[in-house]
Amino acid sequence: MLLSLAATLSDALGWPLWTLYTLSVLVCSVMLLSLVSRAVGLSVAAATKKADAGFKGVEVPAGFAEFQRKYLAVFLVVMLADWMQGTNMWTLYDSYGVDIGTLFLTGFICSAVFSLFAGSLVDKFGRKRGCLLYCALEVVINVLEHYPTFEVLWVGRVMGGFSTCLLFSVFESWYVSAHRARKYPEELIEQTFSKATQGNGLAAVVAGLLAQVAADAAGEIGPFQAAIALTVVAAVLVAMFFDENYGDQRAQDQSLSQSFTQGLQTLKSPPVMLVAMGGTFYEGATYTFVFMWVPVMIGLVGASVPTPSAISYWLPGVLTQQ
C-alpha cells in the first residue's frame, strides 16, 4: 500500500521515487524519536511546558504579543528566503561551469572580514536601515545569480559575505533594542528568540519543499527567483513594522581600531577563547560537510538516476543551525 502511494505521488509530482522514500524514512525517524522521547519523559510538549513555566511569573504587557508577532513575521520570511538560496546554489554553479570552491570560499572569507566592522556600522547608521540594506543586497545578489559569468558571481559572493553578517546580527540587535525601549520584561526576550529558533527550523524544512517546486517550474535558478520575491516581502514588512534604533552612544564614538582592540582584549579571556575556538571548529566541520553534500550525493546516485532534488538539500542546512 505504501509503495503504491509513493508511486502515485511520484507520478503526480514528477519526483524520483527515492526522494519520496527518503522523505518517508525521515518522517518515520522523527515519529520514532518522538515516541522514545515521550517514553523517557523528554517529549517536546514536556519541554515546552517547562520553558513556559519560567514565564508564568512574568506579566505580559499590553501590546507585546503584537510586537512579537511582527518581529517573528519579518524574521521568518527573511530566513525562509535565505534557506531557499542554499538548496540549489551548488548545482546552479555546476551548471554554469564555474569554479564552485572559489565562489564558496569567497563568501566565507568576506563574511569573516566584514564581521569585524559590520555591527558597529549598523549601530551607528541605524538597525532598521541595516535590515533594509540586507534586503536590498539579497535582491541584487539573487539577480546576479542569473548571469553565468564567474566575475559577476564573484561580486555576488562578496556582497553575500556582507549580507550574511547583517542577517545574523542586525535583526536580533534591532529586536533587543526595540524590546527594551518599550520597557518590556527582559525575560520575554528569551521567549521571543526561542520561538524564532523553532520557527527557523520549520522555515528550513518548508524552504526545501518550496525550492523543489520552484526548481521544477523554472530550473536551477527557480529557488533564487522565489527568494527575490520573499525578500521584497520582507523589506515591505520591515518598512511597515520596524522603527529606527541605534547602538550605544559610547560604542558609536569609538573608532574602528578602538573597537578592534577591545574585541581582542575580550578574546584573551580563556572562557571566551574556548567558546570561540569550539564554535570555529564546529562551523568549519559543518560547512565542509554542507559543501561536499551535493557532489557526494550526485556521485552516489550515478548518471543513470535523476540528480538529487532540492528536497534532499535542506538537510545540511537544518544541521547547520543545531
Would you name each region that the model predicts?
Residues 2-75:
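Cytosolic juxtamembrane N-terminal segment immediately preceding the first transmembrane helix
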Residues 126-127, 148-149, 219-220, 302:
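A helix-boundary/kink motif common to multi-pass secondary transporters
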